[in-house]
Amino acid sequence: MTDIFEKCKRTHYSNEIGPELAGETVKVTGWVHEIRDLGGIVFVLIRDKNGITQLTAPSKKLSEEMMADVRAARKETIITLTGTVQESAKAPNGVEIIPSNIDVINVSQLPLPLDTTEKVEAEMDTRLDSRFMDLRKHDVSAIFKIKSQMLHTARNYFYDNDFTEITTPKLVASATEGGTELFPITYFEKEAFLGQSPQLYKQMMMATGLDNVFEIGQIFRAEEHDTLRHLNEALSIDAEMSFKSQTDAMNTLEELIKRILSDISTNCQKELSDLDHELDIPTEPFPIVTYEEVIDIVNSRDVEMNYGEDLNRAAEKVLGETMGSYYFITEWPTAIKPFYVMPNSDDAEKSTAFDLMYRDLELSSGAQRIHDYDLLYSQIEAKDLNPDSFEKYLQAFKYGMPPHSGWGMGADRLTMVITGAKNIRETVLFPRDRRRLTP
């Protein structure tokens, strides 16, 4: 018996078959996407990860047995087609394949959980329930190919700039920033939590002498938000740098974003075309507005915002309409930022914290961090937190902690921006929110 892997071994992907191969024999493997039986001729569209190939079966040119094999094709069945390439202006890529052999690799059951041709639209929940099939649609898989390129570029950028990749625990004994947005779990006979952020570990790494570190990993927040931009499990890109100011950190973040956009523009044109989305690639430095300037902008548009308040949804919308594209917000009030954020040396009520925004969407938060043990200890107390809960973290600040800065960025939100997705669930393979824990 012929080995199944030998049977389905292709010579080309669909996007590699063009008019230049006319007259040649090719072998393609994929899923039956669509079937049109016009009586004297049958068209079968075969889909693989790179596109669609058309099988054309004219009854006058093929045996009855071959026509029977073609007509037996069932949607989403995997087949391997061997045949001759023939030019056809109406077919995908300008060619069709006249079959000489068809091998059925695996037959699909019917009915299908959703329509991969998208002639029948499916609700988001239906799509997520059958995510494996949802990703067979090229506009859906395009999002994850772009996300893959984004993460690949991010890693390359960090490696090129002398960063060391780290992996930090996701099971932790206490909150990173305090608060109640924690998922408690039972850790043998102790209470533990899923990590909100690698922040404390990144800072501890600054005491090791590695200077620059980054991590790409999951974070968990027990937020009850049920919005198009929040999830309870998310992917975060984090960086921390010794002997670098918040301005240096902002420059690193901007450089990374621009390199990601450039690489995606170069390497993902087909995917962007599948999404019918045009990249927004800034050529100028990202604008910077202070927190106080944000208040003036928001209030001038009849949305109330007072000093010491975070941006609410109405304020974000107004700011996004005013600023457009990518921009930084700086000089946030110290009182509303985490305990580890360094106050401004000129005015302690203002901090060194910054946010990177894209229109009305927050992408990243960062700051210069406090490196002085006594100041850090007092800031923990000022936030009504117990320093004893941070004993191991604080220890790293007793023996020569360098001044340092860093940031964390939501990779899923950045994917939304790059792909034009309106719902963050579109950018995560198996999203987790308050209503969804499967698949």
UniProtKB/Swiss-Prot annotation:
It catalyses: tRNA(Asx) + L-aspartate + ATP = L-aspartyl-tRNA(Asx) + AMP + diphosphate. Binds 3 Mg(2+) cations per subunit. The strongest magnesium site (Mg1) is bound to the beta- and gamma-phosphates of ATP and four water molecules complete its coordination sphere. Keywords: Aminoacyl-tRNA synthetase, ATP-binding, Cytoplasm, Ligase, Magnesium, Metal-binding, Nucleotide-binding, Protein biosynthesis. GO terms for cellular component: aminoacyl-tRNA synthetase multienzyme complex; cytosol. L-aspartate binds at E177, R221, S365, R369. GO terms for molecular function: aspartate-tRNA ligase activity; aspartate-tRNA(Asn) ligase activity; ATP binding; magnesium ion binding; RNA binding. Its EC number is 6.1.1.23. Pfam families: tRNA-synt_2, tRNA_anti-codon. Residues 199-202 are annotated as: Aspartate. Its cofactor is Mg(2+). It is found in: Cytoplasm. One of its GO terms (biological process) is aspartyl-tRNA aminoacylation. Disulfide bonds: none annotated. Mg(2+) 2 binds at E362, S365. Signal peptide: none annotated. ATP binds at R221, A222, E223, R229, H230, L231, E362, G410, A411, D412, R413. Aspartyl-tRNA synthetase with relaxed tRNA specificity since it is able to aspartylate not only its cognate tRNA(Asp) but also tRNA(Asn). Reaction proceeds in two steps: L-aspartate is first activated by ATP to form Asp-AMP and then transferred to the acceptor end of tRNA(Asp/Asn). This is Aspartate--tRNA(Asp/Asn) ligase. It comes from Methanosphaera stadtmanae (strain ATCC 43021 / DSM 3091 / JCM 11832 / MCB-3).
